[in-house]
Design a protein with these regions (language model features):
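Secretory targeting and sorting signals
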Residues: 1-33
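Post-signal peptide N-terminal regions of Sec-secreted extracellular proteins
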Residues: 32-154
Length: 154
């Protein structure tokens, strides 16, 4: 009877530990940064976003390129990522840039600029622009940005 009691306590303790461990692992942390990827392409996905860090109240441009599943098995790279600001007097002007010349990648590449305070200066709109490259069955390159911009109500 004493052995059964120990076994039950051990089993109960293991179940409590497993449940507690699962709840800790599965509970998402409250992320302070957010953004939405804007993508195009079928065999090679090219994407940009404005990444907003709510805690620091900053923007950065991010870009990624991915060889899509079932595609032509392309090598990919992204570089010359730019965060651009628009004002009525200057048009689109690059305010942050990341060259990110880390070479070709088998599946995907991700790059981003340093941050900027979107509230410094006059009201603005921002966009992300990047240069995308792919090689394989058919090679190509393009500098692309989505037809959208992000602004911050400061």
């Amino acid at each position: 009877m004493g052995v059964k009691r120990v076994r039950r306590v051990g089993t109960t303790g293991a179940l409590v530990a497993a449940t507690l461990g699962a709840s800790i692992v599965l509970t998402p942390s409250s992320a302070s940064a957010s953004g939405t990827w804007h993508c195009h392409g079928t065999q090679v996905k090219r994407c940009t976003m404005i990444w907003w860090d709510a805690d620091a109240d900053t923007f950065r441009a991010r870009a990624k390129i991915t060889d899509a599943d079932g595609g032509g098995n392309y090598g990919v790279k992204v570089n010359n990522v730019r965060l651009q600001r628009y004002t009525s007097s200057t048009g689109w002007v690059t305010v942050r840039q990341a060259d990110d010349n880390d070479g070709w990648h088998a599946i995907s590449d991700l790059a981003g600029t340093s941050t900027i305070d979107p509230c410094a200066g006059p009201p603005n709109s921002f966009r992300a622009v990047a240069a995308f490259y792919w090689r394989g069955a058919g090679s190509g390159s393009e500098t692309w940005h989505p037809n959208s911009a992000t602004s911050r109500d400061c």
